[in-house]
Amino acid sequence: MENTRAKTTRNSLILLLTATIWGMAFVSQSKGMDYMHPFTFNGVRSLIGAAGILVYILISRKIAGDKAAKLDWKLNVKAGLLCGIFLTIASTLQQFGIKYTSVGKAGFITTLYIIFVPMFGIFLKKKVAPVVWAAAGMAAVGMYLLCMTESLRLGAGDIMVFLCAIAFAIQIMTVDHYAARIDGAVVSCIQFTVCGVVCCIGALILGQPTFGQIQEGLGALLYAGVLSCGVGYTLQIVGQKGLNPTVAALIMSLESVIATISGWIAYKIGFLSTDQTLTPRQIAGCIIVFAAVILVQLPPEWFRFGKKNA
């Protein structure tokens, strides 16, 4: 019992660290915009992340030796390319959006993908639980408070990040479609490579990248690439093993809260030049969005009132 409890505690802390790394990555993404075009940042960051995951794959397969699972390369490459397309769309929209909105707002809007995933199940002829629609309604109210201006307009950055959440939901559903038949690390490496190559092409066409830009923003690039993509992904794999999926999802949801706090701290200490302070109305919106995200992840049996177990 103690060993199981210790393992659960350890894995929970690992996922909390992962959520912290990913939440703080929004700060590095925002900082990177001071030095280079969004395509440049996204391209270099993704290639760094792909390299980090490749190292993890090589080490883990070397340790496994003859016990390493045989790969269906054709299927893994197909899944990686398809997931890479949606990842490219999602991460590009997010990176452009962060340029025009605050770190905290970007963090909370991005987490809406957690609600979109079960909602979009309707297109796959899956039954959507009533609680999902309730969460969607709450999220809409939260989004209104968080993003709507006095002139009843949404900011360009908020719209881009909202579309990014939709793209992330589709990307996650694509991964889920192949999950049982692929190696998650291999597919992740391929999809980051696809994203990196496509964004680097976009940077060459639109961003006019220079070595000086990359050198000045190297700290932000390394954090977003090595820690957020490489280390964060590896920690997620380790932390989720043997942990209750609901607990894991709830811990990972803290990414949005951490993004808001880290963005505010980064502004206060002068690391970010754009004001990251949220108004009371926006904070209320954040709370409602977060509550909706939590609600949609709770076990279905929690909502079966009046039913006795057989």
Predicted features, each with a name:
Residues M1-G43, I85, I89, L93, ...:
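Glycine-/small-residue-enriched transmembrane alpha-helix faces in small-molecule transporters
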Residues E2, S46, R61-K62, G217-G219, ...:
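C-terminal-most transmembrane helix of multi-pass membrane proteins
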Residues R10-T18, D66-L93, M138, A156-C164, ...:
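Loop-to-transmembrane-helix transition segments
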Residues A25, L54, S60-T110, M143-L145, ...:
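Specific transmembrane alpha-helical segments of multi-pass solute transporters/efflux pumps
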Residues F39, I53, V117-P118, F123, ...:
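Transmembrane alpha-helical segments that form core, pore/gating elements
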Residues G52-I57, Y113-A134, V257-R281:
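C-terminal transmembrane-helix exit sites in multi-pass transporters
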Residues I53, V128-M148, F168, C199, ...:
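Hydrophobic transmembrane alpha-helices of multi-pass small-molecule transport proteins
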